Structures are given as structure tokens and as C-alpha cells.
């Protein structure tokens, strides 16, 4: 059962959002060096490039992502290089899990970036006090994912005090993927 179903799509969208910034990439780089002693110079360079690029954007919706393509391509190359370095190492199981989590963080950003631009919303956020910019990417529609992963295997009950008996549930069904789910 899901309570407050009218908020479900927005909550899922928030969870499916990814953010990348100089700060997040520097944290990943530092942790990878500490845990696996890998060369993260390429990642550090990309982090600086991304920060410079983001500073040139206005805060808010990014309607043209073209100028970020070279930076994101360099991020993909740096991530692949780290994958290669890490796969050649003999790491303890616990360390390997931690290292993989940091690489997965980069993967999530790259996967979100790789989605069709018409299926995502991309924007820039900036903390003016610290001068930190972040690239944010979120899916526009979460209904297909909810239909497949949350409602595709078994029946579900969704409740919301904002819905009225006898009213239309169409918008809720559309936003949550209930109209796409194989089970009622």
C-alpha cells in the first residue's frame, strides 16, 4: 500500500535524480585514492573542467546541453580508466564494495546524462555563498519505471486524501504508471 499517492511520482523523481559537481567528484577522487591507490588525475581534471563549464551557465533549466558534451565524454573516459585500474587490483572484499560504490556514483551520472534529452530535465544549481555549482539531471517521467518495478509483479493499493470518491483518478494513474501496469 502507498499512502499519499499523489506525491509518489515526485518522490520517485527526486530519488532518481542525480547531481554532479566539483565537490562530489573531488570526494570520489579522494576516496578512490585512499581506498585503492589509483591514479585519479584524469577525474580531477574533469571535475575542474565541469566546474568551469557550469560557472558559465545561468542557474536553472539547461535548454542546450551541447557545450557540456566534451566534459561528459571526458568523464566517461576517466571513469573507464578507473574501471581498468581497479579491475587490475587485488582488493579485499569490503574495500572492493566501497570502491565499486564510488564508481557506480559516476555511472549513475553518466547513465542519466546518456538518456534522451527529451526524457530528462537538466538544470544547474549554485550555492552562491560557496560558489559551488552542480549539474542536476532527473527523469521527466517515472511512470514506466514505476509500472515495471513497483506495480508489475503484484496488485497495489494507493491512497490519497486529496482524491475524491467519484472523481477521476486518471492523472494519478498516468503519473504513477498504474495505467501501464499489467496488474490492477
Q: What spans do the regions from the language model cover?
A:
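ASCE RecA-like P-loop NTPase motor cores
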Residues: 1-184
Amino acid at each position: 500500500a502507498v499512502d499519499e499517492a499523489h506525491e509518489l511520482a515526485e518522490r520517485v523523481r527526486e530519488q532518481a535524480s542525480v547531481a554532479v559537481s566539483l565537490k562530489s567528484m573531488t570526494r570520489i577522487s579522494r576516496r578512490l585514492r585512499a581506498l585503492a591507490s589509483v591514479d585519479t588525475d584524469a577525474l580531477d581534471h574533469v571535475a575542474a573542467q565541469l566546474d568551469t563549464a557550469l560557472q558559465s551557465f545561468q542557474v536553472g533549466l539547461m535548454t542546450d546541453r551541447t557545450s557540456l558534451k566534451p566534459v561528459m565524454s571526458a568523464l566517461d573516459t576517466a571513469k573507464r580508466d578507473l574501471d581498468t585500474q581497479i579491475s587490475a587490483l587485488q582488493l579485499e572484499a569490503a574495500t572492493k564494495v566501497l570502491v565499486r560504490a564510488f564508481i557506480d556514483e559516476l555511472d549513475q551520472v553518466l547513465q542519466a546524462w546518456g538518456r534522451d534529452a527529451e526524457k530528462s530535465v537538466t538544470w544547474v544549481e549554485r550555492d552562491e555563498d560557496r560558489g559551488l555549482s552542480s549539474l542536476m539531471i532527473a527523469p521527466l517521467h517515472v511512470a514506466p519505471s514505476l509500472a515495471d518495478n513497483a506495480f508489475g509483479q503484484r496488485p497495489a493499493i494507493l491512497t490519497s486524501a486529496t482524491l475524491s470518491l467519484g472523481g477521476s483518478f486518471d492523472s494519478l494513474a498516468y503519473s504513477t504508471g498504474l495505467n501501464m501496469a499489467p496488474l490492477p
